[in-house]
Amino acid sequence: MASLLDSVTVTRVFSLPIAASVSSSSAAPSVSRRRISPARFLEFRGLKSSRSLVTQSASLGANRRTRIARGGRIACEAQDTTAAAVEVPNLSDSEWQTKVLESDVPVLVEFWAPWCGPCRMIHPIVDQLAKDFAGKFKFYKINTDESPNTANRYGIRSVPTVIIFKGGEKKDSIIGAVPRETLEKTIERFLVE
């Protein structure tokens, strides 16, 4: 390990450009000033990143000037959360019969778990579909950790799983986080029947 550290050299971005020379006639060293070339550093401020141009003039222990030129670009934009989203209600085992099996319109049920990453990806899609198909379709979510009886009854082995019920019967199921278009086409297929 010691031999490895001995062989590694690290270049410094700023070194003090001080050239001291001692003349034979005086005991005080003379100092020459040199301008250091600008260095660029990546700077983060919230969701923006930019390169900062830092310029320094150095002298022996006095007057250091720093100029920072900033110009940024957005690294990541936050999603618009101001739109009123439809919150799809959660179901429990006790509500299953009346809300899903006895429904007069088709029902889409999303089986999910709080620890499931793909479930969090599909939640906004199901919420948006509930808004788009309001009145034509009912939408519910059921937490498989809190309602294991219903999940076992329908053989849910992986989450997210979306099941469509019509007339109290299971008609179709989709396993995994799928694109919105896949869910939309499946819903539309049951609207024309």
Swiss-Prot record:
The record marks G117, P118 as: Contributes to redox potential value. Residues 1-82 form a transit peptide. Residues 83-192 form the Thioredoxin domain. InterPro entries: Thioredoxin, Thioredoxin-like_sf, Thioredoxin_CS, Thioredoxin_domain. The active site is at C116 (nucleophile), C119 (nucleophile). Thiol-disulfide oxidoreductase involved in the redox regulation of enzyme of the oxidative pentose phosphate pathway. Under reducing conditions, inhibits the glucose-6-phosphate dehydrogenase. It comes from the Eukaryota. It is found in: Plastid, Chloroplast stroma. Keywords: Chloroplast, Disulfide bond, Electron transport, Plastid, Redox-active center, Transit peptide, Transport. One of its GO terms (biological process) is positive regulation of catalytic activity. Belongs to the thioredoxin family. Plant M-type subfamily. Disulfide bonds join C116-C119. Pfam families: Thioredoxin. NCBIfam families: thioredoxin (TIGR01068). One of its GO terms (molecular function) is enzyme inhibitor activity. It comes from Arabidopsis thaliana (Mouse-ear cress). This is Thioredoxin M4, chloroplastic. The lineage of its organism: Eukaryota, Viridiplantae, Streptophyta, Embryophyta, Tracheophyta. SUPFAM superfamilies: Thioredoxin-like (SSF52833). GO terms for cellular component: chloroplast; chloroplast envelope; chloroplast stroma; chloroplast thylakoid membrane; cytosol; thylakoid.
